[in-house]
Amino acid sequence: MADLTTEPISEATQKGSWVSGLGSLLSYAFVLGLLGLLGWGLIKVNSGQRDSGMAPDFTLTSFDGETVTLSELRGQVVIINFWASWCPPCRDEAPYLESTWRKYKDKGVFFIGVDYADTEKEALAYIDEFDITYFNGPDVGTIISQEYRMDGVPETYFVAKNGELRGTKIGPLFPPELDQRIEELLAEPYAGE
C-alpha cells in the first residue's frame, strides 16, 4: 500500500482541482451578481418621489408645541413644503409661499412647512426673517422626509381634499405655479362636501 502523504500529486489532478475551484468561484460570483441586481431593483422600486396615491400620514409638532396630523385635514387642500434655513432656493421661494398662504388660508387650504436637517435656532430665525405664519415644525430624525422619499430641499407636495397626492415640485416655487395648483385642487369635487 502506498503512502499517500509522500506520493506526488499528478499534474492532471492539480489542473482538475484548479478548474473545479474556478468553476465554483464563477458560480458564486454569478449568484451574488443576481442577488445584487435583485436588491438594486427592489431599492429602485421603493425610491423616487411620491407623486400619486394616498399621501403618507404623519403627525408633526410645530416649533411652538402644537401638533397636526395630515389625515385629520381631510376636506382641505394641503401643501407640504420641505425646507431648510441653509438652503438658498428655499429662501427664494419663502416670500411667495407665505403670501400664497395668506391668500388661501381662509379658503380651505392648509400649509405645512417641514424643516429638514436644521437646528431649531436657525429654523426659527428663518421663520422670523420671512414672517412665516403657516404651520412649521422640524422633521425629527428625518422620518417624514424618508416617508415621502424626498430628494432635497425645497420640495413641495400637493395633497387633494381626499388625501391623495396630486403632484410634487422639486425646487423652488415661483408665481403663479402654486396659485394654479391650489386652484386646480380646490376645484376638485370632494365626497365630504
Map each language-model feature to its residues.
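A short beta-strand-turn-helix
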Residues: 57-78, 101
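Hydrophobic beta-strand core positions in alpha/beta domains
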Residues: 79-81, 113, 157-158
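Short active-site neighborhood of thiol/selenol oxidoreductases, capturing the structured segment around
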Residues: 70-91, 97
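Active-site acidic short loop of glycosyltransferases
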Residues: 74-76, 106, 132, 150
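Thiol/disulfide oxidoreductase modules built on the thioredoxin-like
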Residues: 125-133, 138-190
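Structural microenvironment flanking redox-active thiols in thiol-disulfide oxidoreductases
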Residues: 91-130, 140-147
